[in-house]
Amino acid sequence: MVLINRVNIQPEELPLLYHVNSMDVYNLLQDIGSSKIIIDLRTKEQYEKNHIRTSVNIPPPPSTTPLYENGEIKEFNLSKYIGSNVTAKHWNLIFQKLIVYSDKPFLYNIDELEKTISTTTITTTATTTTTTTTTSNSIGSDQDIIKSLKVSDWDKVVLRHFLLKKKKTKVIIYQGGFDQFQKDYSFMCNPSSSPSSSSGGGGGSQLYPSEIIKDFLYLGGAENAGNRQQLINLKITHLVNMAGELDDVYPHLYKYYRANLDDRPKANIYEHFEPVIQFINDCKKQGGRVLIHCAMGISRSTTVVLAYLMKEDHMTYSDAFTFCKQKRSCINPNFGFVKQLKDYQQHLTLEWEKQEKLKKQQQQTLNINNNNTGIPLSKKLQLDVSDPLSNSSPSSPLISSTLPIPETPPAIILKNEVASPCPIKTTTSSTTINNKGQQQDKAQEEKDSIFSYADKQEKMTHPTLHSPIELPQSSL
């Protein structure tokens, strides 16, 4: 038997508050897996003009509030004020998540908030046992009375109140502001004059599909696939129908991939992984958006979404599942599909290992080729000047007016012998001495004297840069 020291077991420390972006708020609105409340802290006029659907308004107190003077309210009971909204009255007892937004980002110091909340909690606990009172600036007094509330600090004050009173409720703030959300998801906003404040952009009160990849991949059920207005709002161009019992509703309007698959553990969903991934990538290349669905958006459609994430983003099954569940909390592939996904992970791992091994081999071959390209300098020079008029090689230097340095010292030349290291052409030119007597004298001089190869070079003439080297013709 293994004994566990319970003294060392500490509960996971949760963050004080959470931050979300526009897509997260959109997905939270579709989440049926947890209870939530959305709080709008803007003015009543702004809220009535337009707001995120299903949100409730907790506006700053109006100037008609008792003890209101110069933008401040004396002796303000914040808990009672929030409780005047029936939906928000018991928010910390009913809801698992509280999402709060305003018309601008929240300005706060997290260290200051933690210190204030910690101090207020200790003071409140001491008050219940010693009947001491808290400071005038405390939010957490027995009667939740704020001695002096500045209306301009409304967002900050309410946020501190929620953090202080949250219990097990997660406090989530959306920093983008209403205007940003309306820009990204206008169909998820409604004016108060709308017949149903929970309806959304022609989609009625029905939930939209979850957004797995921003502006590209959506996961949902049959109701989403059959709702033309939702497809228009989301700009869907392709659909993947993983349910054999469902017909393609708009085959004349959208491109479909149909799987005809039952939600049974023994059903072969593996064979659809590669074709579906190819279909999704084709949609991406065309700049489209794809909705992947089955009957409920829980098992079959989720499985192929996970397969796509595993291959395209090199995720493990576990990582892909966690990522997808953060976007859609109700996903739950059956155990047979989970096994096939894990088999697919092994297949992908082998493929990645082969690719990595091939890359290493190619790199090693490249390194060897680079190391074996060393050629003696003298041979390179000979290669470069073997054809002085050719410049086909971009690395060849311009033709110089001097000959390349020979690899070995020049040989001694007697009479009409030509040194082999230097490619010398003997031609007749306009500069040749025409006087026969001079030619004979020069020939006699060649017979009687021995000169080195270097001295002979000095006697050579070069009429032009590209003309061949000329030697005087001997009469012998």
From Swiss-Prot:
Its EC number is 3.1.3.16, 3.1.3.48. PROSITE patterns: TYR_PHOSPHATASE_1, TYR_PHOSPHATASE_2, TYR_PHOSPHATASE_DUAL. The keyword Glycosyltransferase does not apply. Disulfide bonds: none annotated. Residues 442-461 have a biased composition (Basic and acidic residues). It catalyses: O-phospho-L-tyrosyl-[protein] + H2O = L-tyrosyl-[protein] + phosphate; O-phospho-L-seryl-[protein] + H2O = L-seryl-[protein] + phosphate; O-phospho-L-threonyl-[protein] + H2O = L-threonyl-[protein] + phosphate. SMART domains: DSPc, PTPc_motif. One of its GO terms (cellular component) is cytoplasm. Keywords: Hydrolase, Protein phosphatase. Residues 425-436 have a biased composition (Low complexity). InterPro entries: Dual-sp_phosphatase_cat-dom, Prot-tyrosine_phosphatase-like, Rhodanese-like_dom, Rhodanese-like_dom_sf, Tyr_Pase_AS, Tyr_Pase_cat, Tyr_Pase_dom, TYR_PHOSPHATASE_DUAL_dom. Gene3D superfamilies: Protein tyrosine phosphatase superfamily, Rhodanese-like domain. The active site is at 294 (phosphocysteine intermediate). GO terms for biological process: negative regulation of MAPK cascade; response to cisplatin; signal transduction; sorocarp development. GO terms for molecular function: MAP kinase tyrosine phosphatase activity; MAP kinase tyrosine/serine/threonine phosphatase activity; phosphoprotein phosphatase activity; protein serine/threonine phosphatase activity; protein tyrosine/threonine phosphatase activity. Residues 32-190 form the Rhodanese domain. Residues 425-476 are annotated as: Disordered. Residues 208-350 form the Tyrosine-protein phosphatase domain. The keyword Hydrolase applies. Belongs to the protein-tyrosine phosphatase family. Non-receptor class dual specificity subfamily. Has a dual specificity toward Ser/Thr and Tyr-containing proteins. This is Probable rhodanese domain-containing dual specificity protein phosphatase. It comes from Dictyostelium discoideum.
